[in-house]
C-alpha cells in the first residue's frame, strides 16, 4: 500500500443473534440491545371465523380456555417471562392480536419502547404503557440511534378469506380491555434494522410494496 493510499474497507461486522419465536415473532440482539418483532407468545386458543372460512384448528386435550372474538384475551405471563427476560425496542408490523397482544406487558416489564402505527400506540396506551415508551410511525421514517438505526417501511398485509380484505380501521383508544374483534390491522409496516454492521429486513406479514424495498 502506497503512502498516499488509505484503507477504505469497513470494519468487520459484529455478532448478531436471532431467535425465532414462531409465527412472525423474532428476538434480535447484538449482545447489548434486544430488539423484538411481533413478539406473540401467548398463543391463545380462539374460536371464530374472522380470518378464514373455518374455525381455528382443534387440538386434542388442549388445556387453554377458548376466547371468542367478542371477548378479551389474557397474556400468558409465564410463557412470556420465560422467553423474554429483556427487551429494548419492540417493532410491531401491524395490530392484529396475534402479533401485538403481548407487547404492552413486555414493555411495562422491561421498559422497552414500542414502535408502530397509531393503532399500535392505542394498544400500548390501552395496556398501560407510558407514552414516553411509545414511538408512533407511518412509514418512511429513518432513525439513527446511538449504536443502531431503524428505517420504517410502508408495507401491506395479505388478502384474507378468498382474496377479500375486510379488516381496515383503527384500534380504538379505551380504558377497558380490547376484545379480539377490536385488534384490527391498523396499517402494516416493515422494518430495516441496521446493527453491528448488519442489515436485517423484517416483515411481519406476507405481502410487501415492491417499490419500497427496491435497492435495499
Identify what each model region corresponds to.
Residues 33-92, 101-105, 160-176, 207-216:
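Pre-active-site segment of Zn-dependent metallo-hydrolases
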Residues 24-29, 189-193:
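Short beta-strand scaffold segments in enzyme catalytic cores
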Residues 10-16, 29-35, 142-151, 194-200:
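Beta-strand-turn-beta hairpins that frame and shape the catalytic cleft
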Residues 76-144, 148-164:
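Active-site HxH/HxHxD metal-binding segment of metal-dependent hydrolases
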Residues 22-26, 41-42:
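Short polar catalytic/cofactor-binding loops
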Residues 22-24, 95-98, 205-209:
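Short beta->alpha connector loops
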